[in-house]
């Protein structure tokens, strides 16, 4: 077994990383191997220098035109592999020391405005009233993410047994294989019960009887299929811009913050290990306040009336 395969097995067993995370690690390492003109199995790690890593990052950024966040993720995958190899005696020097990440702009999370989200929920009512399991399933996908804030990978990995008997909570497996319990709305619990009833009465489970969300082939749905469902439903009611499961997750967190939820409570629900990851939503709230200030403050209106030439210090 080659070094990379052993590293991934260790990550699965010791770090309890999800299959999706492990695939991402392998893909990033394979990308580096291809750039070197070899495979993961034939990478000669002892003959790789710091400059090789820096040249690869330059290639990704300047030739491939990848975003800084993508380049940094790929670097992080290789850096984690290298630390593991150092600890297990597969390499003798730390070439990653001194290799810096690319600077990334701090982008505010994209979310669906509350009024537009009401349109989405209203549009789902006909699906929820249907006896067509696939229409009910699609509505359930949207509502599970929007009302619980779970990640795409967490949704796809759900099993029937993860739903509490009363359908008022769900256990999800987050990053680092960390479990957390998410509350579910009573109305959503009724939808889940209906979905269960349709699913088992029609006996559509073929290969994966445990999986909660199924494809039309009767097996566990994949991430891309969920993305298509979300995109179709959101664009169908006129939601502009990005329409991904992660946008629904951002919408969940943004609405909680706007309704006065504590930041640490939101952190727990989202499964963020670091509060700083959750604090980005406070920046969003500050941006909203700033916009409201510019629209409503009387001195701001005075400034607009004067063409922006007035000495503000004399009028405050």
Locate predicted features:
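Conserved catalytic core of the tyrosine transesterase superfamily
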Residues: 1-316
């Amino acid at each position: 077994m080659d070094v990379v395969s052993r590293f991934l097995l260790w990550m699965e067993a010791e770090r309890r990383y999800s299959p999706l995370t492990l695939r991402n690690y392998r893909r990033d390492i394979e990308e580096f191997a291809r750039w070197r003109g070899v495979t993961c199995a034939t990478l000669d790690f002892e003959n790789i220098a710091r400059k090789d890593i820096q040249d690869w990052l330059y290639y990704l950024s300047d030739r491939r035109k990848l975003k800084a966040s993508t380049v940094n993720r790929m670097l992080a995958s290789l850096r984690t592999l290298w630390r593991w190899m150092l600890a297990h005696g597969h390499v003798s020097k730390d070439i990653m020391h001194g290799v810096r990440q690319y600077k990334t702009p701090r982008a505010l999370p994209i979310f669906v405005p509350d009024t537009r989200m009401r349109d989405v929920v209203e549009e789902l009512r006909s699906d929820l009233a249907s006896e067509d399991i696939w229409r009910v399933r699609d509505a359930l996908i949207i509502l599970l993410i929007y009302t619980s804030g779970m990640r795409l990978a967490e949704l796809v990995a759900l099993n029937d047994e993860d739903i509490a008997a009363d359908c008022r909570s769900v256990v999800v497996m987050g990053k680092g294989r960390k479990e957390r319990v998410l509350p579910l709305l009573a109305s959503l619990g009724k939808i889940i019960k209906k979905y269960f009833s349709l699913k088992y009465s029609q006996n559509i489970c073929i290969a994966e009887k445990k999986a909660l969300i199924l494809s039309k082939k009767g097996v566990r749905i994949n991430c891309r299929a969920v993305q298509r469902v979300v995109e179709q439903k959101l664009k169908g009611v006129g939601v502009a811009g990005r329409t991904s499961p992660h946008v629904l997750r951002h919408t969940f967190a943004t609405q909680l913050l706007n309704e006065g939820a504590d930041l640490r409570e939101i952190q727990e629900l989202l499964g963020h290990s670091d509060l700083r990851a959750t604090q980005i939503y406070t920046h969003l709230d500050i941006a909203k306040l700033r916009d409201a200030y510019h629209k409503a403050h009387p001195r701001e209106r005075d400034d607009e009336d004067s063409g922006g030439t007035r000495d503000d210090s004399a009028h405050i």
